[in-house]
Design a protein with these regions (language model features):
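A generic short-segment signal for beta-strand/edge and adjacent turn/coil regions
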Residues: 28-32, 38-39, 63-66, 99-102, ...
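Short beta-strand elements that form the blades of beta-propeller/WD-repeat-like
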Residues: 49-70, 85-100, 104-106, 122-135, ...
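A generic structural signal for ordered alpha-helices
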Residues: 118-121, 125, 140, 147, ...
Length: 186
C-alpha cells in the first residue's frame, strides 16, 4: 500500500507541474490596449486660486474633508469654503452647521446669502430642495427655498434611508417601512 501511495503522489505532483507549465505557456497573450487618464488640470485644495464666476460657466460642486466649494469645468475655483463641523452642498445651495445647530444660513454658489433655516436639526441640500433632519433621528422637515418650513413628518422609527426628486421624497425607516411623500407631504 505504501508503494502504491508513493506512485500516486509522484504521479499527481508530476501532473500538477506539467499542468502549470502548460497553463503558463498557453495563457501568455499580449495585453490589450491600456487606457490611462491624464488630468487636464489640477487644483491644490490647500490653497486654491479663487477666480470670479463667469456668467456662462457650468458649476460643479465638491466637498472634500472640511472644505467645500464650486469649480468650473475648466478647473477654475469660484468658491472655496472651510467649515468646522458638518456641511451640505448642492448645485443651488450650500450651508455649514454644528452639532447643536438651531439655525443655519445658506448661500448660493456665488456666496450670496439666500436665507436662514430656523429649525433645530441637520440641513441637507439636494439640488434645489432643502431638508432638515430633526433631532431624534425619526423626523424631517421640508423647507421652501427661503428656508421657511413647508411641512414636517415625524415617525416612530429612526430614518435609515432618504432620497428625493422633483416629485417628492422616499424615506426608509429602521423598522423596514418605506414611505413616499409628494412635494406637499402627502
Amino acid at each position: 500500500i505504501l508503494m502504491k501511495t508513493k506512485k500516486s503522489i509522484s504521479f499527481f505532483i508530476s501532473l500538477s507541474v506539467i499542468f502549470c507549465i502548460l497553463y503558463i505557456i498557453l495563457a501568455i497573450k499580449p495585453l490589450g490596449k491600456e487606457y490611462q487618464f491624464t488630468p487636464e488640470w489640477k487644483i491644490d485644495v490647500a490653497s486654491p486660486n479663487v477666480k470670479p464666476l463667469k456668467d456662462d460657466s457650468q458649476l460643479v460642486y465638491f466637498k472634500l474633508g472640511q472644505t467645500m466649494g464650486y469649480f468650473t469645468e475648466d478647473g477654475d475655483v469660484v468658491n472655496f469654503i472651510t467649515f468646522p463641523f458638518k456641511a451640505s452642498i448642492s448645485d443651488y445651495f450650500y450651508t455649514s452647521y454644528t452639532a447643536n445647530n438651531k439655525s443655519a444660513k445658506f448661500y448660493s454658489p456665488d456666496a450670496k446669502q439666500l436665507g436662514t433655516i430656523d429649525i433645530l436639526g441637520f440641513p441637507m441640500m439636494d439640488k434645489d430642495r432643502i431638508y432638515v433632519f430633526l433631532p431624534g433621528g425619526n423626523a424631517f422637515a421640508v423647507c421652501n427655498q427661503d428656508g421657511t418650513k413647508k411641512w414636517e413628518y415625524s415617525g416612530f422609527s429612526p430614518i435609515t434611508a432618504f432620497d428625493s426628486s422633483a416629485n417628492g421624497c422616499v424615506v426608509g425607516f429602521a423598522d423596514g417601512n418605506i414611505t413616499e411623500f409628494d412635494t406637499n407631504g402627502n
